[in-house]
UniProtKB/Swiss-Prot annotation:
Task performed by this protein: Catalyzes the condensation of pantoate with beta-alanine in an ATP-dependent reaction via a pantoyl-adenylate intermediate.
Assembly behavior: Homodimer.
SUPFAM superfamilies: Nucleotidylyl transferase
Full protein name: Pantothenate synthetase
Similarity annotation: Belongs to the pantothenate synthetase family.
Superkingdom, taxonomy of origin: Bacteria
Pathway note: Cofactor biosynthesis; (R)-pantothenate biosynthesis; (R)-pantothenate from (R)-pantoate and beta-alanine: step 1/1
Keyword Acetylation on entry: no
BP terms from Gene Ontology: pantothenate biosynthetic process
Length: 313
């Protein structure tokens, strides 16, 4: 039997691999030389938010950055048009070259699921809450593909944006519960000048909808400033802003603790919103300090002169 030839890797260049086995072989070899492998999973259609994740990953000393580009069919449900999801591979690879990324993993559905989806990761009760209530099976699909990516790449760290906050919490839960030896790093949401969270889906908004979409981040900001008066005041302030834009159909607006459990009486929490504008579903969230008049852990209270708004870059 002929021995398999080593997979080629050119240091300092963008190496594009489709086969999971090739990525596994290359990252194993790189680790043996002392390189730290870090992963940025994406579904392509890269924008500044993705590039921010990549830049955060590149700051890891000695890191070789792996960016996966895979539109995962398992996380699309009924009524969600998988075929319409933007696919811009050539542009994405050009962006990765410009950022100095060394590995792009671009598998097909057949590469990732050669025998179909016989095995999947169940997210537990949180997977049926918030986003999961509107998108049954979504998080099982997300966790399954992330679990596979972590086993294929075996990264020291993997980087995810805080915009998809429930996803971030569930991935951290999975890594802990399944003893996966990867540190999950959350990166703050990247925003447009008016506060709108960057998303590949923003391209579906028309000009009027794009202007209206700024109400989501404005609502979160209003809630953040009201948080010192409690969770109910937080929700009331955010809801008042959203109510001013009738075109926004709110799916949920909730305050939870940082792990998305019940809202705390006082302390660190998360304000989350999901809404539909036209045919586009938008998500956003922000950290809030419930009932905190003097800040938490030495951080200034939101609204104080020393507090920096999250999108004042």
């Amino acid at each position: 039997m002929t021995a398999r030839r080593p997979t080629r890797f050119a240091k300092g260049e963008l190496n594009v691999y489709r086969a999971p086995r090739d990525v596994t072989d290359v990252t194993r070899a790189l680790r043996s030389t002392g390189r730290r492998v870090v992963l940025v999973p994406t579904m392509g259609a890269l924008h500044e938010g993705h590039l921010t994740l990549i830049r955060a990953a590149k700051r890891v000393q000695g890191a070789v950055v792996v960016v996966s580009i895979f539109v995962n069919p398992l996380q699309f449900g009924a009524g969600e048009d998988l075929d319409a999801y933007p696919r811009t591979l050539d542009d994405d690879l050009a962006a990765l070259r410009a950022e100095g990324v060394e590995i792009a993993f671009t598998p097909t559905v057949g590469d990732m699921y050669p025998d179909g989806t016989r095995t999947s990761v169940h997210p537990g009760p949180l997977g049926d809450d918030l986003e999961g209530a509107s998108r049954p099976g979504h998080f099982a699909g997300v966790l399954t593909v992330v679990c596979k990516l972590l086993h294929i790449v075996r990264p020291d760290r993997a980087f995810f944006g805080e915009k998809d906050y429930q996803q971030l919490v569930l991935i951290r839960q999975m890594v802990t519960d399944l003893n996966i030896d990867t540190k999950i790093v959350g990166v703050p949401t990247v925003r447009e000048a008016d506060g709108l969270a960057l998303s590949s889906r923003n391209r579906y908004l028309d000009e009027v909808e794009r202007e209206q979409a700024g109400a989501l981040s404005a609502a979160l900001l209003a809630g953040m400033y009201a948080a010192s008066n409690g969770a109910a005041a937080t929700l009331d302030a955010a809801r008042a802003v959203l109510d001013e834009v009738p075109a926004i159909e709110v799916d949920y607006l909730q305050v939870r603790d940082p792990m998305l459990g019940p809202v705390p009486h006082e302390g660190a929490a998360r304000l989350l919103v999901a809404a539909r504008l036209g045919q586009t579903r938008l998500l956003d969230n922000i950290a809030v300090d419930i009932g905190a008049s003097d800040g938490i852990d030495g951080h200034p209270r939101v609204g104080s002169p020393d507090h920096q708004l999250p999108w004042r870059n």
